[in-house]
């Protein structure tokens, strides 16, 4: 089925009981709120619609992310923010990783999230015999030295027949830093590590467990909070927002305000249920 182009979210609003908004590229970018996006969010909430921010960002705790969104002018509550990092406690519980020394490639907030999950966080250069690696962000550590250290440590553990668990909270490869300005993020670091580990270890290379979009755990958390699956995913990236929703059995709307610029006749793969070139604010 070809994507349906709409001119306003009003056209399809009543088909859904809840809405999942990506953050960067949909509601905001590195310069602040995206014009129109925040107003659509506010209008939906005023009309009694359930809304959540569903973001791969894991450089902040949910509390910090909520405070940052509010400071930008977005009216949002803590229970409306689902970050990929906030999935760590459930994952550590399910996989029996509590009490494990955990190497963190991320921010101070990521260390805090690991502690809340029951892990014992450390840096890659701390000379700890860690058994868990979490790739969450690309800042606040020396990039190349850290990747070299993690590659070496994981290879040594696997070759010594010791368990090693790799977790990627944020599978995004790039992100919009500002209008027309892009940067690499955590998913790209994991790609480098995966390639290096596969080259050295072959079939014994441990895979990354991926928690954020387009993978199922973050959508499952949204469904758990909503209590149903009648949700519309609104995103700007085909490879994360749209693919993830499609795979999970949710409808998706691609908004052309972020990484994917929608042009007439453009073939979109994967294909969203709807497309919207830019945010338009209803008169009511």
Predicted feature descriptions by range:
Residues 1-49, 58-82, 89-284:
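Asp-based, Mg2+/Mn2+-dependent phosphohydrolase catalytic module
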């Amino acid at each position: 089925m070809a994507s349906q182009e709409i001119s306003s979210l009003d056209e399809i609003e009543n088909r859904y009981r809840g809405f999942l908004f990506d953050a960067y590229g949909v509601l905001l970018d590195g310069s602040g709120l995206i014009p129109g996006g925040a107003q659509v969010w506010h209008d939906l909430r005023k009309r009694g619609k359930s809304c959540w921010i569903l973001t791969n960002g894991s450089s902040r705790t949910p509390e910090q992310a909520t405070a940052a969104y509010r400071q930008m002018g977005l009216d949002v509550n803590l229970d409306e923010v689902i970050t990929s990092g906030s999935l760590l406690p459930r994952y550590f519980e399910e996989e029996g990783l509590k009490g494990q020394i955990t190497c963190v490639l991320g921010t101070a907030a990521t260390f805090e999230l690991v502690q809340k999950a029951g892990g014992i966080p450390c840096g890659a250069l701390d000379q700890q015999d860690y058994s868990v690696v979490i790739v969450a962000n690309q800042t606040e550590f020396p990039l190349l030295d850290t990747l070299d250290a993690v590659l070496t440590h994981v290879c040594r553990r696997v070759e010594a027949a010791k368990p090693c668990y790799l977790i990627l909270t944020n599978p995004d490869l790039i992100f919009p830093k500002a209008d027309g300005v892009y940067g690499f993020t955590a998913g790209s670091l994991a790609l480098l590590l995966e390639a290096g580990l596969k080259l050295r270890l072959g079939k014994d290379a441990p895979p990354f467990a991926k928690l954020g979009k387009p993978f199922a755990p973050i959508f499952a958390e949204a469904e758990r909070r909503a209590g149903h699956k009648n949700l519309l995913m609104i995103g700007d990236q085909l490879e994360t927002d749209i693919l993830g929703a499609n795979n999970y059995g949710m409808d998706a709307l691609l908004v052309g305000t972020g990484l994917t610029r929608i042009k007439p006749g453009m073939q979109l793969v994967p294909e969203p249920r709807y497309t919207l070139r830019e945010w338009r604010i209803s008169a009511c």
